[in-house]
Amino acid sequence: MAVKIRLRRMGAKKAPFYRIVVADSRSPRDGRFIEEIGYYDPLKKPAVINVNAERALDWLKKGAQLSDTAKALLTKAGVLKKTAGEGQ
């Protein structure tokens, strides 16, 4: 089972809110997921990114792949800097 960390769109029309989830890569964007590890609200100024870093790092160690957007958000939240520091 290929697992990805990606965004799941929530909210109303023209008012998106995203949950950062771990899901099987074959499931639809807003479909079934394994675990919710955070959220992203782009409408707030500044945009709010809240991620459970411990769970995200745990899934990355298990081999989960990041979508491009999830990678950018985790980098901005400082989660991926923690993985780079662990390798040293």
From Swiss-Prot:
| InterPro entries noted in UniProt | Ribosomal_bS16, Ribosomal_bS16_dom_sf
Entry's Pfam families?
Answer: Ribosomal_S16
Q: Which GO terms describe its cellular component?
A: cytoplasm; small ribosomal subunit
Output one GO MF annotation: structural constituent of ribosome
Keyword match Ribosomal protein: yes
Keyword Transferase present in the record's keywords: the answer is no
Any Gene Ontology biological process: translation
Q: Which HAMAP family match?
A: Ribosomal_bS16 (MF_00385)
Q: Which family does it belong to?
A: Belongs to the bacterial ribosomal protein bS16 family.
Q: State the name under which the record lists this protein.
A: Small ribosomal subunit protein bS16
Q: Which organism is it from?
A: Pelotomaculum thermopropionicum (strain DSM 13744 / JCM 10971 / SI)
Q: What is the lineage of its organism?
A: Bacteria, Bacillati, Bacillota, Clostridia, Eubacteriales
- Gene coding for it: rpsP
